[in-house]
UniProtKB/Swiss-Prot annotation:
InterPro entries: Lenti_VIF_2 (IPR009979). It comes from Jembrana disease virus (JDV). It is found in: Host cytoplasm; Virion. Keywords: Host cytoplasm, Virion. This is Virion infectivity factor. Residues 10-22 have a biased composition (Basic residues). The gene is vif. It comes from the Viruses. Residues 1-22 are annotated as: Disordered. It holds the Pfam family Lenti_VIF_2. Its main location: host cell.
Amino acid sequence: MERTIQSPMGRRRGSSGRRKRNANIISPPAYAIYPAPQYRYPRWEFVMNDLYSQTARLQKEEIIITYRYAVWAREWKIQTGFLDLGYLMTPAGTHTTGELNELDLFWVRYTLCQHRSPKWRELLLGEMTHTSCRRTAQAAVVSHTKPHTLQRLAGLTLVCNQNLCWYPVGTVTRNSPLWMHFTTGKEPTIQQLSGHP
């Protein structure tokens, strides 16, 4: 049997189009809205922004950055010509959702040199004997990318910005995640990444 609606107004779907009698100037915070609004698709902008983590992995000369919110995950692919994730890293304080497509999200990792490129984990674990320099990274970029491509341009830009690098501090073990919050050893939240306490 068809459901009868117990209201004289018919079935009203959304409230966005209609005039509200005394619409408040200041809107209540989300937790005060009752019952909780049901959306038909996830609204990226409004997801609680402390439920957030970011990881990157490499696949066939592409860096794949995964931003993971509470329930949904979203991926960005950034084409780089070279295959070693060891040359790239994400600094603290650069990423908001809007800045994601910018290349200066990434910096090259090493600053000093004996002209050989170390592995990043080695460096963090304190097992490093040499430290690397821009020249090495530049050589790596040039040897792994085709000339006159955006990849090479991007790679060389990263190498130029190399002194802007940032290291996560703290105990790093062989299988710890690439980005770590420096006091707790967990992956950082968006506030920590953006420099808020």
